[in-house]
């Protein structure tokens, strides 16, 4: 799905394209209600939690069987989101925040943790342990979203897949955020490289992929350089 929910109309355009072709596949529609870590204080952060919940409710009512995933930023949000979201996602920058991790473990059965860009794959076992100690029945997944490569680059470490599989319930590759180039007033990216990561993920035996897609990426309110065109996803879904 899109980086930000942006609007109900934008979500409808994405879902109208994906819903028919994703039947029979294990997939989640992703959209963020709040882009809480924007580079600039003036950047659009999205609809916010209250309007976001309305959009999530509309999706559930309009597209039966669609599962939802969104990111959380503060512990109090867990309870509010639990009635709408099938899998909660902990952002990479927040993956060591114990109160947030515990809140997710208390309210969700499926938790996707983005690996911090500065952390070794082995260090993620501590995050998984926190969740499992609070909720032993929770399914905990780890998403590789790139490791810091110099001051303004990220590079996925394909060696980490088997390491993180050994203590989690699955490992995903974030194809789009792994191409980000944190710099200046905006965060850059490389959607063409993201497409190559998506096609290569199965070679490294990831359990799944995380891909942000948008009908008009260059005009998206966030991650305009890394989101993949919706038509590309439609054309390549059976190759991913």
Question: Predicted segment positions?
Answer:
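Structural motif
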Residues: 83-84, 204
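Conserved beta-strand positions in the central sheet of alpha/beta enzyme cores
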Residues: 28-30, 69, 89, 112, ...
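Catalytic beta/alpha-barrel core
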Residues: 47-48, 63-77, 86-100, 109-121, ...
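Glycine-rich, proline-tolerant flexible connector loops at the mouths of alpha/beta enzymes
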Residues: 2-10, 27-49, 213-224
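Catalytic alpha/beta core domains of metabolic enzymes, predominantly
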Residues: 108-213
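Glycine-rich phosphate-binding active-site loops on the catalytic face of alpha/beta enzymes
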Residues: 4, 92-94, 197, 201-223
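Glycine-rich anion/phosphate-binding loops
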Residues: 4-17, 47-54, 188-196
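Alpha-helix-loop-beta-strand connector modules within alpha/beta enzyme cores
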Residues: 17-23, 44-69, 103-110, 161-172, ...
